[in-house]
């Protein structure tokens, strides 16, 4: 959606809907970050299948998929109801959770941005945005000499000057550009 592709009749959307409706890789805690089949192929170490790692690393993909499902899929479907439950659980846990995995913050940003249109509950939006802002600011690698290694660059979360995270991070964003 960020790239402007919103035609839900497009074959790519239809394929996504079909996959999500199948509930493949959906567990009681969300969608798996990695799957057992990963271990059959050459891979980076973080792609090794681990159900324990999935419980943390799935936060980001689950939040993102929940936002997508709740915005685009049939409200009467089984996967919609599960996404609604998972989204509520994620939002309820945001303020107290300690570990978000590598993609958790980005997933939460997508879910919280969609929240005003989802009608899934009454949440304290300023508190949610405050927590996300805190997490974004804490996760961005401030040492530009370390940017050549794996780490969180400002552009991971800040895609434009209109981002709510831009004002507090303008200087570091400008260094990345």
Which residue ranges define each predicted feature?
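Preference for long, amphipathic alpha-helical scaffolds in soluble/luminal domains
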Residues: 1-177
């Amino acid at each position: 959606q960020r790239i402007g592709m919103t035609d839900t009749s497009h074959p790519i959307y239809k394929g996504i809907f079909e996959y999500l409706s199948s509930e493949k890789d959906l567990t009681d805690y969300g969608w798996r970050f990695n799957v057992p089949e990963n271990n059959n192929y050459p891979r980076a170490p973080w792609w090794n299948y681990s159900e324990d790692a999935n419980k943390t690393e799935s936060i980001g993909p689950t939040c993102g998929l929940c936002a997508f499902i709740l915005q685009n899929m049939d409200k009467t479907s089984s996967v919609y109801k599960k996404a609604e439950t998972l989204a509520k659980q994620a939002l309820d846990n945001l303020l107290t959770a300690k570990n978000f995995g590598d993609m958790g913050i980005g997933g939460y940003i997508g879910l919280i941005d969609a929240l005003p249109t989802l009608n899934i509950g009454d949440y304290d939006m300023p508190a949610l945005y405050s927590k996300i802002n805190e997490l974004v600011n804490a996760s961005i690698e401030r040492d530009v000499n370390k940017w050549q290694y794996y780490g969180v660059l400002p552009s991971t979360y800040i895609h434009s000057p209109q981002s709510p995270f831009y004002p507090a991070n303008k200087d570091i964003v400008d260094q990345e550009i």
